[in-house]
């Protein structure tokens, strides 16, 4: 799988800098990658990016890994065909997180940014009526379990926070959730100047905006403390989230509305039945 790619022709990130106006701690310090023996010199997000050769090596490895997984999924689907059970089997494929390949001068995962929280999610097989179609509706991982329950004819537990996606599997353009939510605990790692406390980031993503609120976090009591910072990104103007608009006066009302919606939480965002 490594040999499938010409490293020199692979695209590199063109926004190898932290979002303008965002707090230094919001871009993760790539602790996972930094633990490898040959990556101890990985720059912190606010420093100059790695040289192009190192970037291309990592991007090459990522593409090779994706191709490997693609081949394994193919083996699974071939087995379902061979056993004659493909048509009455529900197949769901999703990524558990996004991945930075130099974007925001970061690598790996673990932020509240779009690059780390947006993933592919594919339903195939039994019960999927809108074959070979895509939906731009806002969906979340918590939606997968209730969807599988309904597709399998099982009762959907009332206490779940997710919504069955069965209506979208027939009508991909159907009006759906008002927002999706994510949450990330930033521990005591990253650049030395950002390690004085742990922080919890709460994020809401609407059709147009991503809004994040950061709070001090008490890991012992599992409670949030003082507000530390906010981030606001307009995806119509800035799909790569390169400029934090939280302190832009022209977005003050938008920020206030999004903050209220974030506080109201997932119940506010549920699709109308």
Where are these regions (language model features)?
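Short loop segments at secondary-structure junctions
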Residues: 125-128, 153-155, 171-173, 207-209, ...
């Amino acid at each position: 799988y490594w040999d499938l790619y010409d490293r020199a022709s692979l695209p590199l990130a063109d926004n190898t800098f932290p979002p303008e106006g965002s707090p230094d701690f919001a871009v993760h310090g790539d602790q996972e990658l930094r633990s490898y023996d040959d990556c101890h010199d990985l720059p912190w997000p606010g420093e100059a990016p790695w040289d192009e050769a190192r970037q291309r090596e990592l991007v090459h490895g990522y593409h090779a890994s994706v191709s490997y997984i693609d081949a394994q999924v193919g083996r699974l689907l071939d087995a379902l065909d061979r056993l004659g059970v493909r048509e009455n089997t529900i197949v769901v494929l999703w990524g558990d997180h996004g991945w930075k390949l130099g974007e925001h001068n970061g690598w790996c995962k673990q932020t509240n940014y779009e690059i780390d929280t947006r993933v592919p999610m594919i339903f195939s097989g039994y019960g999927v009526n809108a074959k070979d179609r895509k939906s731009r509706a806002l969906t979340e991982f918590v939606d997968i379990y209730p969807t599988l329950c309904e597709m399998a004819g099982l009762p959907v537990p009332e206490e779940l926070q997710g919504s069955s996606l069965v209506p979208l599997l027939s009508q991909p353009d159907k009006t759906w959730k008002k927002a999706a939510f994510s949450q990330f605990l930033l521990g005591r790692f990253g650049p030395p100047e950002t390690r004085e406390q742990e922080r919890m980031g709460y994020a809401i993503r609407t059709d147009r905006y991503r809004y994040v609120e950061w709070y001090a976090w008490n890991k012992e009591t599992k409670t949030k403390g003082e507000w530390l910072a906010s981030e606001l990104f307009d995806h119509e103007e800035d799909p790569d989230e390169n400029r934090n608009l939280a302190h832009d006066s022209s977005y003050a009302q938008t920020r206030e509305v999004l903050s209220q919606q974030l506080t109201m939480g997932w119940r506010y965002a549920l699709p109308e039945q």
